[in-house]
Amino acid sequence: MRFFNVLVPVAVAALLTSAGGAPSPAADPALLAPPVNTAPGPEYADDTRLFQGIPGIERAANGRLWALWYAGGKGEGPDNYAVLVTSGDDGKTWSGPKVVVDPPGPVRAYDPCLWHDPQGRLWLFWAQSHNWWDGRAGVWAIVTENSGDETPRWSAPRRLSDGIMMNKPTVLATGEWLMPAAVWQRKAGTDAAHSHDLGPRSGANVMLSKDRGDTWSYLGQAIVPNRVFDEHMIVQRRDGALWMLVRAAYGIGESLSADGGKTWSEGRRSEIPHVNSRFFIRRLASGKLLLVTHNPPDGKARSHLVAHLSDDDGKTWQGGLMIDERAGVSYPDGVQAPDGTIYLIYDFSRTGDRQILMAAFTEDDVAKGQWLSPRARQRVVVNQATGKAAK
């Protein structure tokens, strides 16, 4: 794998999987690899940003934390870019932008994700689309082998598949990797020349890699009733079955696969209470499942982020640690350290306070529903944007 200190756009036509044949990157700027800025200037400073949210978090083997989200413009749209920051003191202080992915023109970078693979490499994923949504988008990634360094060297950007991937991949017992990549059930919101219709590929798609991420191929798809943006996550149960949870208008839909993700059961509404927003689920080192959802009194608001545990693969849930009860908190993502500490990141008030926040806690805190452990921390500010709109 080649690494660069300065990453420049390259054509990636050979990697494209769009329906009806791949147009040339020159004719479709969303297919061009964007510049990856490893020395962001003042134009990306906190005091320039009017909007930010949708964060992800990861932890290197030496304890270095990484946080990622997207910002740019006044909201979701063509001015969006992805921002990466880091902390070398367990989240007490955070750097300014270390990497910015900012495609030129009306192409945006959004819904980013961080993930350490089993080899210890840190992947930085993002979606790329012409304007807000072009009907196809695309999952892109850069990778580093030295995520413990404050300024790691990154690979050149690569387009992995169509769709949008904002949640971490799942490594199966076989060693295969599954990546959730959604094609939204929405008409393209851009001009006709840059609009696409992927037809039956619209859904909660699953991409497969058998070679540690070198190549990805379409494996299968689940469809749940009243799906919205999918934002699906997959866990492998102890019996080997795959359980997919999908964002839906009523909260969370679900589907099961007994053949490694090739085919999926008819989607249905799950029994997990939640609102129309992203959730987070992950298997912990203990074998228990951690689930973070919204549990507001009215059943609708993006408030009351709560963490629960399951020791029976999601049949029942115990505990209940209130992460943040305020209106406007959303989009949790998390990672567990070897010492058992769970780091959770989420956003608060994307166009108001514009905060990216972190919490740290343990399984015992979740089980008891209280912030008891010495490692427990609430509402740690990772970043706050302070830009002011021009009058």
What are these regions (language model features)?
Residues 1-5:
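Positively charged n-region of N-terminal signal peptides that target proteins for export
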Residues 6-18:
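Bacterial N-terminal signal peptides
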Residues 24-391:
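Asp-box/BNR beta-propeller blade signature and adjacent active/binding-site loops
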